[in-house]
């Protein structure tokens, strides 16, 4: 069983591509950051502007592991899926899948950490934790 999945789409832009006309691999990490930012601003109700500028907190990436499965090309429409694999005291494990035209292109796991003004990990605030919980994959 699984929890909710956050899904969004984005078209591959010219700036995303290398001279071979395929997505330059570091651009996927920028795209993932955008997906996380959209997830926070949307269903989690806490935009990065609010977190960073008003609350003085952030959610940096502590770890990421990626698998490049098939190339994506200019003007491909990509579908991004995000699910939560683990919700710790201050950390959150994410699973990302990128597909286009029914073909898996990229997948990654990522760990983000809730960090306070001191730049040290702090527990997720309960209201935010409660909004993350529905995205948690249920383990059998």
Each PLM stretch: what is its role?
Residues 3, 68-74, 85-140:
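HotDog/MaoC-like acyl-thioester-processing domains
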Residues 40-86, 106-107:
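Hydrophobic beta-strand-centered segment that forms part of the acyl-chain substrate-binding groove
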Residues 2-61, 117-140:
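Hot-dog-fold acyl-thioester-processing enzymes
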Residues 11, 65, 111:
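Short aromatic/hydrophobic contact patches that present stacked aromatics
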């Amino acid at each position: 069983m699984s929890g909710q999945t956050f899904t969004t789409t984005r078209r591959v832009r010219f700036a995303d591509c290398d001279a071979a006309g395929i997505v330059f691999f570091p651009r996927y990490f920028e795209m993932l950051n955008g997906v996380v930012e959209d997830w926070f601003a949307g269903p989690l109700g806490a935009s990065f502007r609010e977190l960073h500028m008003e609350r003085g907190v952030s959610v940096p990436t502590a770890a990421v592991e990626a698998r490049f499965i098939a190339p994506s090309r200019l003007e491909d429409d990509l579908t991004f899926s995000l699910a939560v694999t683990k919700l710790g005291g201050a950390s959150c494990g994410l699973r990302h899948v990128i597909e286009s035209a029914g073909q898996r292109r990229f997948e990654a796991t990522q760990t983000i950490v809730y960090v306070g003004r001191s730049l040290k990990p702090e527990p997720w605030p309960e209201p935010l934790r409660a909004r993350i919980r529905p995205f948690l994959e249920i383990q059998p």
